[in-house]
Amino acid sequence: MRTLCSLLLICCLLFSYTTPAVGDLKHLILKAQLTRCYKFGGFCHYNICPGNSRFMSNCHPENLRCCKNIKQF
């Protein structure tokens, strides 16, 4: 019984451990989102885009939004 509990504990600890590769992957995705925003002429802004711009996408999972200026003729 003790061996079974020990094995179960080891498996739980092993599978609950987050590897650094997962953190690096998340960082690369966020960097790609930020690069895409700047590539299409956007800028990152908190909460709501200003009046002279429109929402394009998100820069990060937090409340940063990618906004793009509206050209006025």
From Swiss-Prot:
Residues 1-23 form the signal peptide. InterPro entries: Defensin_beta-like (IPR001855). Disulfide bonds join 37-66, 44-59, 49-67. One of its GO terms (cellular component) is extracellular region. It holds the Pfam family Defensin_beta. The keyword Magnesium does not apply. Expressed in both adult and neonate brain, and very weakly in kidneys, epididymis, and testis. One of its GO terms (biological process) is defense response to bacterium. It is found in: Secreted. Keywords: Antibiotic, Antimicrobial, Defensin, Disulfide bond, Secreted, Signal. Has antibacterial activity. PANTHER family: BETA-DEFENSIN 10-RELATED, BETA-DEFENSIN-RELATED. Belongs to the beta-defensin family. This is Beta-defensin 10. The gene is Defb10.
